[in-house]
Amino acid sequence: MDATLDLIASDGFEGVTIAAAAQGAGVTRQTVYSNFGSREELVSQAIAGLAVEVLGGIHSRSNATDTTCEYVVELIVAGRAAVRAHPVLATLLQAERGNPVFDTGMMSRAKPVARELLEPLVERDPGVKSSLDDIVEIALRLALSVVLFDDDAVHTDDDLRRFLTRWLSPAMPSSS
């Protein structure tokens, strides 16, 4: 996966091939195919792994929140900050061929990652369990929108927090 991330950083998504990833990792193409099945899956898993690693660092920030809404808001704010700060994640902002954000099936690959990041909500408030799928769906769609369509109205973290809180608060389950 590191070889794939190196290729994305140096050549963009178009530079990622099974052969190039195998060469960079020092393994055979068959090994890469056996582990990932396709170029798209290789890229998606590499980006998802990096996203989980980068966003994993925000749990202390999210754990300091009091409500489900605040947790989701902080996760989205931190996610946008990570995309802005990390060179490989920043490539997600470019509408280039091979970008996994624009691949068919992207949502089905992104939902398990989002679910993993939002699963701590159930531990904090078991009443959230019945709504978790909906929370994953709305948080993922909002996060993608925030990352892809930056705007002056929500450019700063505080502006984004206010916007997200205003619209997410009525939609989130009450904490018990």
Residue ranges and their predicted role:
Residues 55, 99-137:
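Amphipathic alpha-helical packing segments from all-alpha helical-bundle domains
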Residues 9-13, 30-43:
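HTH DNA-binding helix-turn interface
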Residues 78-108:
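Amphipathic alpha-helical segments used for helix-helix packing
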Residues 13-20:
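Ser/Thr-centered, proline-biased regulatory motifs
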Residues 20-23, 32:
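Append "Primarily bacterial transcriptional regulators
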Residues 2, 66-84, 133, 137, ...:
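Amphipathic alpha-helical segments that line or abut small-molecule/effector binding pockets
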Residues 81-85, 120, 137-156, 167-175:
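Amphipathic C-terminal alpha-helical segment
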Residues 2-10, 24, 41-61, 74-78, ...:
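Alpha-helical structural segments
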